[in-house]
Amino acid sequence: MFISSMNPVKKNNSGGILSRIQFPEDIRMLDIGDLTLLASDIRSAIIETVSRTGGHLASSLGTVELTLAVHKVFDTPKDRVIWDVGHQAYAHKLITGRRDVFSTLRQKGGISGFPKREESPYDVFNVGHSSTSISAASGIAEARDLKKERFKVVAIIGDGSMTAGLAFEGLNWSGDRKKDLVIILNDNEMSISPNVGALSSYLNHIMTGQTANKIRKDIRNFLKTIPSIGEQVLEFSRRAEESLKALIVPGALFEDLGFTYVGPLEGHRLDHLIRNLEDVRNMEGPVLVHVITRKGKGYKFAEAEPLRFHGICPFSPETGKPAAASESPVPPSYTQVFGNTIVKLARQNPRLVAITAAMCEGTGLNAFAEEFPERFFDVGIAEQHSVTFAAGLATEGILPVVAIYSSFLQRAYDQILHDVCLQNLPVVFALDRAGFVGEDGPTHHGLFDLSYLRSIPNMVVMAPKDENELQHMLHTAVACGKPAAVRYPRGSGVGVTMDSQPFSLELGKGEVLCEGGSLAILAVGDPVHPALTAAVQLREEGIYATVVNARFVKPLDRELLLRIVRSFKKILTVEENVLTGGFGSAILEFLEENDIHGIQVKRLGIRDEFAEQATQAEQRRLYGIDEQGIAAAVRSMMNMGRSSQMEACL
């Protein structure tokens, strides 16, 4: 839906210049003084909203001036602006028609935390994963020329995203094609000293100004008319210009790829940015603009701890501390349990190493990295490389554990298949954020891993019912000597007692948690405990369910399944994964392979659609995989019939 179809809600500001801004054409009338005040208003609105909703704060605070400069100089939405990842796009949303609904950021039915084409014509390309902007922008530029239209295409990409192979593939292609394309590299890891910044700014303004470009073009045309000597002088002048610039700015790589390099530019000086972008707008061919920004700019807590404020839960704007939580003790998160367990396993096995793709803290590997720095590898945003790197380690007897978010592992499917499983290498995949992730929405849900992993030969796929079982599954994965994946959800554990040491489970064996005679509920992973709760509710209605914790999606516990199908004619499967190709599909395939008929199977999971943003609880309720949904599905299957069988809960 376009934003105009949404109902306005309370504004984020009580006044100020932001209250007068709806669309980019409004900011094009402002002078530098007013733009500076607007930047302050925008930062206040972002901090106020994210403190309540959570979100990606530091990146968005760091790109406020850059956002204003881009929209002031370029004729958006006619000119296309593509944001990479989208973490930095909150200011963009505030000045492109979404100011009055910004308070709904990342909420159910509200605006997305990422650019979304369905939301606004200013959002040119849907994003959420990194490093896609350059390839997308090059495609848009090609389409523009095929249609013989005239508009500028601008991709804005962070320095972290530049570590991915996809970004370099896009650079290589677009530099070779020589289409009109502007890539803005938002570099928030470097700082510029005043002298270098001033000299670089002056040199770049001269080299990119319209007058300089016209003189350069006229001289080149004249020299080309002089046989032999003209071409030599032209080549010498080009090299001299590049050599002078290379002494001052780090743009040689981009120049070699076919781009005109501009920068580095100070990313928080609006006059400086606007002047240079105006020059860039009038240039032809591929241009890379290098802009230096500071993550968390304007909010002291985010400037001091940009990593903690990258993606943050609700917090107090006054103190920067997390919002007050319940005084009751909170179970450890699955991420924490993984981090603690992998350290224990590494102490026992000197061959074990850990790999992450720019998510050391997010995946819980901080303690491992500190205790075993020589056995810890952060490869940057390079998921494909991380998997094949792990495969290479495994061929030499090293035991790699790749810790990665479920949705990001999708980017390395071929590497899992071709480089790990085809060789049957013992690589362990620890898949954090499997299932619903909540407010980050469809780009970040981990709802496909059971389906795409169980389709690969040699792969073992596990999902724990709680945090204690997670540590045992990690031990199992490390010890099994095969490619193995353990997927676990975002958030806190169930609150069960933790065993002091992890141990291996029997490979491919599930467990019966609760026995009854009415029907069988086969659950895997996080839905196991809701299934148990539903069984308790149903007992009061005279429906007695057997609840099975499958543990393994691959291999299945064939012995247990044969016992189930001999005892029940009704089976309900529950998973936090898409139904297509998932755990329920594996059960149906088992029945077909064993020529078993007359069994009614109902599958609960995610329909053939992309799940939208909401809280995890809201999402589970929507798809019927919470205790109420499971109980309702059982009642439907039983037609509210009553069983005379008694239940024995273990």
UniProtKB/Swiss-Prot annotation:
Q: How does it assemble?
A: Homodimer.
Can you tell me which residues bind Mg(2+)? Answer: D159, N188
Q: Show the taxonomic lineage.
A: Bacteria, Pseudomonadati, Thermodesulfobacteriota, Syntrophia, Syntrophales
Q: Which NCBIfam families match?
A: dxs, PRK05444.2-2
Cofactor(s) this protein requires: Mg(2+); thiamine diphosphate
The cellular component terms of Gene Ontology attached to this UniProt record, alphabetical and capped at eight, are: cytosol
Chain segments annotated as coiled-coil in the UniProt record: none
GO MF entry, a single one: thiamine pyrophosphate binding
Known EC number(s)?
A: 2.2.1.7
Q: Name one GO biological process term.
A: isopentenyl diphosphate biosynthetic process, methylerythritol 4-phosphate pathway
Q: Which organism is it from?
A: Syntrophus aciditrophicus (strain SB)
The protein in question is named 1-deoxy-D-xylulose-5-phosphate synthase
